[in-house]
Amino acid sequence: MYYPFVRKALFQLDPERAHEFTFQQLRRITGTPFEALVRQKVPAKPVNCMGLTFKNPLGLAAGLDKDGECIDALGAMGFGSIEIGTVTPRPQPGNDKPRLFRLVDAEGLINRMGFNNFGVDNLVENVKKAHYDGVLGINIGKNKDTPVEQGKDDYLICMEKIYAYAGYIAINISSPNTPGLRTLQYGEALDDLLTAIKNKQNDLQAMHHKYVPIAVKIAPDLSEDELIQVADSLVRHNIDGVIATNTTLDRSLVQGMKNCDQTGGLSGRPLQLKSTEIIRRLSLELNGRLPIIGVGGIDSVIAAREKIAAGASLVQIYSGFIFKGPPLIKEIVTHI
């Protein structure tokens, strides 16, 4: 496969520049016959989850295609689902550059992007143009300059605008790169947010005559008590699924490596065990009451199987896709 050569060239570039260059090329071929260049035939392995039928259990995690610019090209690679975003009500530039770093030896990434995106209206226009026939998830967050106390309003604005176009909606309250965001994972703040989101979901269901499931994305850095509390809240509010996990602030497995001290969330292989353990504990706590989408450090068939054995119904990749390329999709879907 050609990807090792492509990766070698891309890894000569700054990580964000490499991402921009790749997306530039994908945008050029999206919706054209040249999409065949990235198309892969993968076996159909349908999974029913959250009331939806996924073509296969492997999805693309949020963060790669923040604005939904390359849905069709990414879909051609064989993903059973694609989660675009995180998107916010208003466009925002994100944090200052550099803000994305490779830990090549560990096959990890550290990012402090800060929800850079062109806003929810732009994303909706991109989604309208796409022809992807898999499940499209849309991951939503709050603008950096929205006070945390008013954060729920941003989620409700996004829900209203994307509801008609989303297969499912992911609520991102676990990015470490938006000040105060993770506080929405706890106690009254979480209950308040989930109550508002569930009420909005019911209103939108009545308006659009369709039910769009809601999944909440959680952090891997939760304590045992926090995890129990989160699980309890998700069940009480009849949330449809949970995505475990986002990136970690823990650097214990990458000490001494180049870029290890950069501020931000760590993803990729160093996150693998930590996220799997959260899934295992969450699965015990939930006891089948809602499905888990497992994400964090999946870079092989074995790693994907571990997530499913721990209790995940579906899995997602991001950093592993950067390091291994499209062949990883086919490999996982074929052998999972």
UniProtKB/Swiss-Prot annotation:
It is found in: Cell membrane. One of its GO terms (biological process) is 'de novo' UMP biosynthetic process. The keyword Oxidoreductase applies. Binds 1 FMN per subunit. FMN binds at A62, G63, L64, D65, K66, T86, N139, N172, K217, T245, G268, G297, Y318, S319. The active site is at S175 (nucleophile). GO terms for molecular function: dihydroorotate dehydrogenase (quinone) activity. One of its GO terms (cellular component) is cytoplasm. InterPro entries: Aldolase_TIM, DHO_dehydrogenase, Dihydroorotate_DH_1_2, Dihydroorotate_DH_2, Dihydroorotate_DH_cat, Dihydroorotate_DH_CS. It is an enzyme of class 1 (oxidoreductase). Pathway: Pyrimidine metabolism; UMP biosynthesis via de novo pathway; orotate from (S)-dihydroorotate (quinone route): step 1/1. Its cofactor is FMN. SUPFAM superfamilies: FMN-linked oxidoreductases (SSF51395). It comes from the Bacteria. Keywords: Cell membrane, Flavoprotein, FMN, Membrane, Oxidoreductase, Pyrimidine biosynthesis. It is a peripheral membrane protein. Substrate binds at K66, N111, R112, M113, G114, F115, N172, N177, N246, T247. Catalyzes the conversion of dihydroorotate to orotate with quinone as electron acceptor. Monomer. This is Dihydroorotate dehydrogenase (quinone). It comes from Shigella dysenteriae serotype 1 (strain Sd197). The lineage of its organism: Bacteria, Pseudomonadati, Pseudomonadota, Gammaproteobacteria, Enterobacterales. The gene is pyrD.
